[in-house]
Amino acid sequence: MFISFEGIDASGKSTVMDLFAKYLKIKFPEKEIVTTFEPGGKNLKEALQIREFLLSKNNQISPYVEMLLFATARRIHLERLIWPALKAGKIVLCDRYIDSSIAYQGFGNGLDIDLVTSLNSLISENTFPDLTIFLDIKISKAFERMGIFRDHNRDRLENRGVEFYEKVINGYEFLAKKNKNFFKIDGNGTYDEVLDLIIDFFEKYYASWPK
């Protein structure tokens, strides 16, 4: 089982994903739960070096180069972590995946959507999540969280304006309409409230999942 979590920066997806992993460990005690993230991946030196480069405020790169770097890190992530884990029958939860590239590089940065989609289909060999959970949060709330928790330490990708994030959200809305396995969850509540919404949805969704 492969589940990705999506949302704009400071949407709470990282925290909620970790909480959801604890729920899955109880629901599926016989399964190993693997949590990971993009860009980068847990303990993947090369992919994490790309992540550090992408997030650094000191690096000024074009949207096209950004797209290629994300794709490169994703391929490493797949080869070294995601594919082996799925092959071993583990449940993989990933904080960001291909949909982030479409929403951020495609809609946010204005690159051709078909180009971004085709590139990521190629490098992933059409490996897509069984389920994608998109935490839909107001931009004002996300910016409030960024200010409270990160102050002046925002990275290059977080340090963008409202107009950019509006485009990104439009991208996620596009994906929600296009992909039958892409589901929107209200992310404006507390972490526990959002987790309850996800668990309630997952229980119903998994009950109808082909076994």
From Swiss-Prot:
CDD domains per the UniProt record, alphabetical: TMPK
GO molecular function: ATP binding; dTMP kinase activity
TM region(s), chain numbering: none
InterPro entries, per database record: P-loop_NTPase, Thymidylate_kin-like_dom, Thymidylate_kin_CS, Thymidylate_kinase
Domain of life, source organism: Bacteria
Binding residue positions for ATP: G7, I8, D9, A10, S11, G12, K13, S14
Keywords assigned: ATP-binding, Kinase, Nucleotide biosynthesis, Nucleotide-binding, Transferase
Catalytic activity line of the entry: dTMP + ATP = dTDP + ADP
GO biological process entries: dTDP biosynthetic process; dTTP biosynthetic process; dUDP biosynthetic process
GO cellular component: cytosol
Pfam families named in the record: Thymidylate_kin
Disulfide bridge map: none
EC nos: 2.7.4.9
Described purpose of this protein according to its UniProt entry: Phosphorylation of dTMP to form dTDP in both de novo and salvage pathways of dTTP synthesis.
Family of this protein: Belongs to the thymidylate kinase family.
Name of the protein: Thymidylate kinase
Organism of this sequence: Mesomycoplasma hyopneumoniae (strain J / ATCC 25934 / NCTC 10110) (Mycoplasma hyopneumoniae)
Gene behind this protein: tmk
